[in-house]
């Protein structure tokens, strides 16, 4: 890696160091760039290693941190003009709480963002093929779920011990002083204490929680996603004969067979059925396996030990957070109840002498809509009560009739597009019935009339718009798990404040 030194003013706002670019416009901390010499000093220790910089990536000097904190607190510098600006004032609200902790927190956020994200980008780009083929959640559900026998469902732990984060960063940041600084900041801010790892509006700009959360999830993805190919190469040959060994061990007492362990005794056809499939959505991940129950239990134990000792997990709850081993018939995910239904096909086999008809069995991905999801979602938005009885939307009474009907039609379009993958269309018909009754109740409450008088008019108008919206629905003969469609629908769900 080429090492460049010089004045930051001469190099311009875009500083180039090998393949790593620093653009000051991308950072949210203008106070830290008042002393550019101190900023580039934070990168000096890493660059001083020369060609071995990648081996110790992220080794930073805390001398620059102290200088930056001192420059911010320097009374001789006039920071009042900077505080008067609206943008900087919004970023420095924390100064009212702690004049020392706030610049310390901003500097910690800056170093973590620079030290961790380029490494994440480099690792993900080198393994992009594996990430694209396995980590796509919808392809995982379509292609892998129906072929699996057991599903491991787990949530990322919400409460971590603070030392767990320190141990994670210790592998990337070799500066012991900075790690002690992180410990102080984490304990002061109580990072991850009682917080979920994904909240749409939880993270604020400039918060140290954002790089910590992203790096933590990236570490779990790297541990669970990347090594499976290497596990198959180096470990599956040792894991595959486990079931065979148990069977043969029982046969030893019934016969004089003597089992000999060698490479030729490995059944590679048996090894091919031991694939592990991994998928994650927000803070919940699924691991599907095609192996036997014994192999899955062994892999579950191996995974638990791996995560426990790799991340040094210390959770408030004594219950293991990764212990749900489910069959492919009762998995709740993305607002669906995921099923792998058995299907049979008649196959005609023609031979020289005769024609035979045989039955070929298989599994098909069969997502269903649970009643609890519909009732809970509609009750949250005040379209029905928690027993499923439709009620009027009182917040929409002040709107015009057209806006009320348009609101219900838009809600139906979102539901029908998202739940179009369901095989039980009866639940969709029940959903439109609930929305129709709620629409009638809303219009009746607005005009202070009975539902019966308005039903004819509202039914005609709403049904015409619903029929017109059918062109947006995907055909049942095609795959409906489209990431672009689901992404657009999730945006609508976020706007409507409907959680999945």
Curated annotation (Swiss-Prot):
Classification via PANTHER family = MATURASE K
Q: Where is it found, in Gene Ontology cellular component terms? A: chloroplast
Is RNA-binding one of the keywords?
Answer: yes
As for subcellular location, the record says: Plastid, Chloroplast
What InterPro entries does the record tag this protein with?
Answer: Domain_X, Maturase_MatK, Maturase_MatK_N
**What are the recorded Gene Ontology BP terms?**
mRNA processing; RNA splicing; tRNA processing
Q: What family is this protein classified in? A: Belongs to the intron maturase 2 family. MatK subfamily.
Q: Which organism is it from?
A: Adiantum capillus-veneris
Signal peptide coordinates = none
Gene Ontology MF terms: RNA binding
Tell me, what does this protein do in biology? Answer: Usually encoded in the trnK tRNA gene intron. Probably assists in splicing its own and other chloroplast group II introns.
Protein name per UniProt: Maturase K
